[in-house]
């Protein structure tokens, strides 16, 4: 089975409401879809989301990156293509992820297995994802949280910004109003060390499951100090792109957990390397995503079922934020629960 053609197209999906974080705001998910065709008629599909503020890649960069390397993969097997992608291609992590996802999709077809079985999953019982509550005015965020809970969502990821008093206020309000919910707080690098400590001190009587990337990604010393003093688990996100990053954070105890995203690490094969490293060290992870298209989310969901012993939290809620639920998924969402079709 050899690769004979690679095509790309730009896609956009409208969201129910604007998605707001400390880093960006958007009303649509924009991504590049990649189709890789083999000589036996099999087609592998991958996607790359445009999240320039995090990965440095916009739609144009993703398209030109893929175009610059696609001829390298023609007439190669998918195994050969994966090897070439990760050893010979100096392109961004999201562009790389789109090709990696497509190649792995083809390998699962060649093996005649659904993706979760190809990854080694044996337990198909439901998983649970969080849902994101976008950064907004406190009353809007509280209303959004209540609405999410009424729709069966009981794991809430609260996006907060640099205004630490607003963050303290809204997290307390949501936790008080919705005591049945698990609360995850995501600062997206917006806080200083001092404000992070202030937030933690103000959460002594508020049950929080984790704080995600409170300080800027390069500040691993600060992140480590916060992890040491915090009674709330600390999750590293933007600080961890590659296996090398993950090893450093885990081995130097800079955080209690790491967030693995296909768009950060360069695809599903690289995510597996990080998950295997974490599994061998009994270190828990979140499997997360950017705002992404349905095929890349679908791939991550399959992976989540295979590594449920390592993955403490699933943050793959993009389809729940779309204006319309996509038909491309191999899973069904029932509130927070995710089940294979």
From Swiss-Prot:
Keywords, comma-separated and alphabetical: Isomerase, Magnesium, Metal-binding
Gene Ontology BP, a term: peptide metabolic process
Family in the record: Belongs to the mandelate racemase/muconate lactonizing enzyme family.
Protein name as it appears in the record: L-amino acid-D/L-Glu epimerase
Disulfide cysteine pairs (residue numbers): none
CDD domains: L-Ala-DL-Glu_epimerase (cd03319)
PANTHER family in alphabetical order: O-SUCCINYLBENZOATE SYNTHASE, O-SUCCINYLBENZOATE SYNTHASE-RELATED
SMART domains registered for this protein in UniProt: MR_MLE (SM00922)
More info: Part of a large, functionally divergent protein family. Protein modeling and substrate docking was used to predict the substrate specificity, prior to biochemical analysis.
Function: Catalyzes the epimerization of dipeptides with L-Glu in the second position. Has epimerase activity with L-Gly-L-Glu, L-Ala-L-Glu, L-Ser-L-Glu, L-Pro-L-Glu, L-Val-L-Glu, L-Met-L-Glu, L-Thr-L-Glu and L-Phe-L-Glu (in vitro).
Residues where substrate binds: 132, 157-159, 261, 315-317
Needed co-factor(s): Mg(2+)
Binding site residues for Mg(2+): 186, 212, 237
Cofactor info, note text: Binds 1 Mg(2+) ion per subunit.
UniProt-listed Enzyme Commission number(s): 5.1.1.-
Species of the source: Sulfurimonas denitrificans (strain ATCC 33889 / DSM 1251)
């Amino acid at each position: 089975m050899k690769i004979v053609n690679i095509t790309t197209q730009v896609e956009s999906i409208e969201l129910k409401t604007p998605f707001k974080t400390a880093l960006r705001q958007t009303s649509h998910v924009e991504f590049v879809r990649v189709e890789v065709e083999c000589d036996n008629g099999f087609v592998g599909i991958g996607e790359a989301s445009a999240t320039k503020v995090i990965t440095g890649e916009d739609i144009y960069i993703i398209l030109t990156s893929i175009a610059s390397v696609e001829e390298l993969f023609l007439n190669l097997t998918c195994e050969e293509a994966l090897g070439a992608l990760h050893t010979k291609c100096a392109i961004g992590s999201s562009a790389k992820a789109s090709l990696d996802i497509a190649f792995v999709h083809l390998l699962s077809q060649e093996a005649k297995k659904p993706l979760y079985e190809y990854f080694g999953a044996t337990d198909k019982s439901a998983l649970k994802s969080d849902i994101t509550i976008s950064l907004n005015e406190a009353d809007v965020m509280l209303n959004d949280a209540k609405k999410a809970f009424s729709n069966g969502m009981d794991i809430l990821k609260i996006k907060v910004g640099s205004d630490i008093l607003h963050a303290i206020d809204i997290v307390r309000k949501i936790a008080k109003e919705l005591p049945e919910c698990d609360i995850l707080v995501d600062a997206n690098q917006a806080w200083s060390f001092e404000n992070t400590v202030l937030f933690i001190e103000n959460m002594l009587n508020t049950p929080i499951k984790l704080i995600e990337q409170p300080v800027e990604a390069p500040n691993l010393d600060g992140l480590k100090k916060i992890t040491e003093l915090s009674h709330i688990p600390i999750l590293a996100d933007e600080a961890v792109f590659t296996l090398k990053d993950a090893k450093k954070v885990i081995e130097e105890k800079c955080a209690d957990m790491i967030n693995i995203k296909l768009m950060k690490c360069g695809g599903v094969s690289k995510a597996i390397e990080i998950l295997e490293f974490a599994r061998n060290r009994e270190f828990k992870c979140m499997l997360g995503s950017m705002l992404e298209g349905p095929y890349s989310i679908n791939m991550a969901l399959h992976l989540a079922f295979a590594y449920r012993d390592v993955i403490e939290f699933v943050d793959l809620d993009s389809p729940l934020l779309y204006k319309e639920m996509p038909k491309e998924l191999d899973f069904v969402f029932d509130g927070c629960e995710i089940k294979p079709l």
